[in-house]
Amino acid sequence: MPPKDPDSSRTPESRSKSNRPRAIRRLVIWYRRNAAVTSLVDTATSSASAAGTVAGTVANSMLQPLVFDPLRWLQGNTDDEEIQEADRLWVAVDGMGGDHAPGPILEGCLEAIERLPLKIRFVGETDKVLEAADALGLSERLAQAQAADHLDLVASGPSIGMDDEATAVRRKRDASINLAMDLVKKGQALAVYSAGNSGAMMASAIFRLGRLKGIDRPAIGALFPTKDPGQPVLVLDVGANMDCKPAYLHQFALLGNIYSRDVLQVEQPRIGLLNIGEEDCKGNDLALKTHALLRDERRLHFAGNCEGRDVLSGAFDVVVCDGFTGNVLLKFLESVGSVLLGVLRAELPRGRRGKVGSAFLRSNLRRIKKRLDHAEHGGALLLGVNGVAVIGHGSSKALSVVSALRIAHSAASHGVMEDLAALQSGCD
């Protein structure tokens, strides 16, 4: 018998259904191969229409983050073209601070001056900096940055190691972290960044810049992502003070309130106290006494206790806690992005449908990782000293350095120190 025409016994509706998987596969292949940004939207729309109802549904729910959002990002990613020389601010960088310094630190600085309105005073041991630049193929970019007066190399003496005691800042007076602090103190830089020994960073900031009047202990404040991409939450302290008094947490709240208002542009920051329950009567002695102080503070909008599950909910703009608890919270969050992606990869089907689904989800997974990746929030502010100081993770790579320098620039350009000085005068 002659073979039957496969389409002769099918209704138009059944033929349309059988073509849908093929149309979806074609759509996936197209998206992978097509790099023409100018025709992305038109092509995506026509492909979705050709794929029928199923692909249309997929397009509505999936192509928004996969096509339209990346298109907007590509069209808006022109920071380097908009930089005006008059807008550039000097930032001092401890070039020898970090597990892998000075190479990744230098690379991040060179990236930052191309993306952000910054000038860098890079403090480090000159021979090691030039060797690292040569090893990473950065020598030409470094020379160009120096010629354009965007980067200035400042020679330093032996650096302070990651395992050194904080008191080493007194012995090694010409260490890179000390000289970087001096640049801020002398007004030759508006902010300082270091990914080195955090204890030495704090000690140098206190000795060289000094504490703000009325602030007993500086605090490290880190920005945590929330379910709203445009609304991070500031958590402090995340590691500077292991044992705290209620008065310290009260001061942390005042510092965080100013930063959230000035830099994050939150009109009336909601202050939360990290605790084990929402009720006023919950918590240990530290939490109970701090709660009373924050409740009676008229300069703050105290929103009550914040449970651990509410830190990333968007219900609070500033959350205060002791440094021990905050550091545990910070380190836990650093692991969330990679663990979440690993679970999703393991759970996705491995057959044909799984491959198609994975192709559609790939961009979403990357965006999730980006929002949760601690490298995207590569710096924490040291609040309470008389200058803008940003602390980076010891293992910081170039991306983390750029992120930290963005934080430094934002703090320096939004008048944070002026308002902190006003807070200081209020303590007279």
From Swiss-Prot:
Region (Disordered): 1-20
Cellular component, GO annotation: cytoplasm
Location within or outside the cell: Cytoplasm
Pathway given in the UniProt record: Lipid metabolism; phospholipid metabolism
SUPFAM superfamilies reported for this sequence: Isocitrate/Isopropylmalate dehydrogenase-like (SSF53659)
The entry's keywords: Cytoplasm, Lipid biosynthesis, Lipid metabolism, Phospholipid biosynthesis, Phospholipid metabolism, Transferase
GO aspect biological process, one term: phospholipid biosynthetic process
Known EC number: 2.3.1.274
Signal peptide (UniProt feature, chain positions): none
Entry keyword annotation includes Cytoplasm: yes
Any single Pfam family the record assigns to this protein: FA_synthesis
GO molecular function, one term: phosphate:acyl-[acyl carrier protein] acyltransferase activity
Broad class of enzyme this protein falls into: transferase
Domain of life: Bacteria
Catalytic activity: a fatty acyl-[ACP] + phosphate = an acyl phosphate + holo-[ACP]
Biased composition (Basic and acidic residues): 1-16
Functional summary from the UniProt entry: Catalyzes the reversible formation of acyl-phosphate (acyl-PO(4)) from acyl-[acyl-carrier-protein] (acyl-ACP). This enzyme utilizes acyl-ACP as fatty acyl donor, but not acyl-CoA.
Subunit description: Homodimer. Probably interacts with PlsY.
HAMAP family xref list: PlsX (MF_00019)
Family membership noted in the UniProt record: Belongs to the PlsX family.
Protein name: Phosphate acyltransferase
Organism (species): Parasynechococcus marenigrum (strain WH8102)
Gene name linked to the record: plsX
